[in-house]
């Protein structure tokens, strides 16, 4: 068995597709009207449909999960994020951990937590 996808709930599929394309370069692999699979295995699920599926309230900003991305140029990504046309809610702007990795944490348009870190060698 292997993990195939990670699903996040979004309020506006079109805005979310644009967000993940513009900032992370993710393309649409499959669009099933309310359920969109992007490259890298990220799935965007329409909030109204998801609520019907699970019959539970959806909790934004739950801080229980995060999407993690790595980049070779974290400073350039930070500039790209600052210039994005939608407001970005930061958890922390560019910071450096004690082990030398630089990271930025923020929420997507629907309160899903994202971390972008500088690539560090496993050596």
Features from the language model and the residues they span:
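N-terminal beta-strand motif that seeds the catalytic metal site of vicinal oxygen chelate
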Residues: 1-15, 65-67, 120-123
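Short glycine-enriched loop/turn motifs at secondary-structure junctions
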Residues: 1-3, 59-64, 97-98
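Short beta->alpha transition motifs characteristic of CBS
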Residues: 8, 98, 105, 116-123
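Short beta-strand-to-loop elements that line the ligand-binding cleft
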Residues: 8, 29, 93-96
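Vicinal oxygen chelate
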Residues: 13, 67-113
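Amphipathic alpha-helical segments
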Residues: 14-26
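Short secondary-structure junctions
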Residues: 25-30, 87-91
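Conserved short beta-strand elements that form part of the metal-binding/catalytic scaffold
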Residues: 27-61, 113-118
